[in-house]
């Protein structure tokens, strides 16, 4: 029995809702996607719910679920995964947080992403904060991808029951950090002091002085959320399925998830996780890894960002960019030897500007797949696909079965 290889492609935030200016089509339906449409005709379509129907999923919990883990059991907060993703070496008693560089004016958050500052700017600002902020505990503060950063409070894991200061929408003041016990109260007090000192550092930083002169939103505030400790992973993905697994990822959170479950992670030069990401660099690296690994995971972020920015046209353009990436890959592999799944980790409808509980389009193609009669890859066509509506949790088992790598249950 021939064992095939697997390629899981996640177009982050792929799913959407009908857009009036597109004549009622979604960005995926509106975009020109000849390569994914070709695969749709050769494969089988369906929909998947990352967690459960109607439940908006975070990128962290969604990816854990899609890789076959129950997020209700293993998830311990986003922050630790972000920290793993930026390559930090952490101890089990550390407490980590996801941080956004944001813009505050007169006590009101006016931009939760500081005009989507660049990764380079974020890293420079984070360095200044690390060097100038003084706290009663040891801490690590580093830039991640784009407007994102990671904060680690060393030895403070017992204080994980702490709230956040992120209001989750512009036009509101930041929250005060809440707590549930004495340990988390101390963490809340440390975070308040950290944010206060960081604000002072950011206000006078040359990067923000330059952004002010250019009329851009300044990154003068920190929004902190997602307190996390080490995830409770019962068995690595690589151990469970007895495969060598590699991943092509630019975004720190998703890198962290992949590393936590045993993937070797690669970020080719030019892969930024932003709108300017080099999709061909990611495609070429994916083809290269398929020669070496049994299972490859390819993550593409910009589709999600456009949904958060309520920009349907840009989302369609990013989907077309992803389609070119996929086109290169299928030109350089033998589909009979590989099982490919293409989906999103969740839906990010432009009208919502956030994750929603809408089901996500799913396409599976390659050796062993029984094609249905669908013609293109889009939300409505996926509704009539042969896969039906499945749990995100089921995607990898379906792939592994088609790859002839699953084991029989029973005699």
From Swiss-Prot:
Pathways involved: Carbohydrate degradation; glycolysis; pyruvate from D-glyceraldehyde 3-phosphate: step 3/5
Keyword check for Translocase: no
Top-level enzyme category: isomerase
GO terms for MF: metal ion binding; phosphoglycerate mutase activity
InterPro entries referenced in this protein's UniProt entry, alphabetically: Alkaline_phosphatase_core_sf, ApgAM_prokaryotes, Metalloenzyme, Pglycerate_mutase_ApgM, Pglycerate_mutase_ApgM_sf
Reactions catalysed: (2R)-2-phosphoglycerate = (2R)-3-phosphoglycerate
Keywords linked to the UniProt accession: Glycolysis, Isomerase
Enzyme Commission numbers on file: 5.4.2.12
Superkingdom, natural source: Archaea
Keyword Isomerase among record annotations: yes
Family, per entry: Belongs to the BPG-independent phosphoglycerate mutase family. A-PGAM subfamily.
Biological role stated in the UniProt entry: Catalyzes the interconversion of 2-phosphoglycerate and 3-phosphoglycerate.
Name of the protein in question: 2,3-bisphosphoglycerate-independent phosphoglycerate mutase
Native source organism of the sequence: Thermococcus gammatolerans (strain DSM 15229 / JCM 11827 / EJ3)
């Amino acid at each position: 029995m021939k064992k095939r290889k697997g390629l899981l492609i996640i177009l982050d935030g792929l799913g959407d809702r009908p857009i009036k200016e597109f004549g009622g089509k979604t960005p995926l339906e509106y975009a020109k996607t000849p390569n994914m449409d070709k695969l749709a005709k050769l494969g089988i379509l369906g929909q998947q719910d990352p967690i459960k129907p109607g439940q908006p999923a975070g990128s962290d919990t969604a990816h854990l679920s899609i890789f076959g883990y129950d997020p209700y059991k293993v998830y311990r907060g986003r922050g630790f995964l972000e920290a793993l993703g930026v390559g930090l070496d952490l101890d089990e008693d550390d407490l980590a947080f996801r941080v956004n560089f944001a813009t505050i004016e007169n006590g009101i958050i006016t931009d939760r992403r500081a005009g989507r500052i660049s990764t380079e700017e974020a890293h420079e600002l984070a360095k200044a904060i690390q060097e100038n902020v003084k706290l009663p505990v040891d801490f690590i503060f580093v830039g991640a991808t784009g407007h994102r950063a990671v904060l680690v409070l060393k030895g403070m894991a017992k204080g994980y029951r702490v709230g956040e200061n992120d209001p989750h929408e512009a036009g509101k003041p930041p929250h005060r950090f809440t707590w549930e016990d004495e340990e988390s109260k101390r963490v809340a007090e440390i975070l308040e002091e950290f944010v206060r000192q960081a604000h002072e550092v950011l206000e006078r930083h040359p990067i923000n002085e330059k952004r002010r002169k250019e009329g851009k939103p300044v990154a003068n505030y920190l929004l902190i959320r997602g307190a996390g400790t080490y995830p409770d992973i019962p068995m690595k993905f690589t151990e469970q399925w007895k495969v060598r697994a590699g991943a092509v990822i630019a975004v720190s959170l998703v890198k962290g998830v992949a590393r936590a479950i045993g993937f070797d992670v690669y970020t080719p030069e030019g892969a930024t996780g932003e709108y300017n990401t080099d999709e061909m660099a990611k495609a070429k690296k994916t083809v290269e890894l398929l020669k070496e690994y049994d299972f490859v995971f390819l993550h593409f972020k910009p589709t999600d960002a456009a949904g958060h920015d309520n920009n349907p046209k840009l989302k369609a353009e990013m989907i077309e960019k992803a389609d070119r990436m996929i086109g290169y890959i299928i030109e350089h592999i033998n589909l009979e030897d590989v099982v490919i799944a293409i989906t999103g980790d969740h839906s990010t409808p432009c009208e919502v500007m956030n994750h929603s509980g809408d089901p996500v389009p799913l396409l599976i193609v390659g050796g062993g797949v029984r094609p249905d009669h669908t013609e293109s890859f889009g939300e409505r066509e996926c509704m009539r696909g042969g896969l039906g509506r499945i749990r995100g949790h089921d995607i990898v088992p379906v792939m592994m079965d088609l790859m002839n790598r699953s084991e029989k249950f029973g005699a």
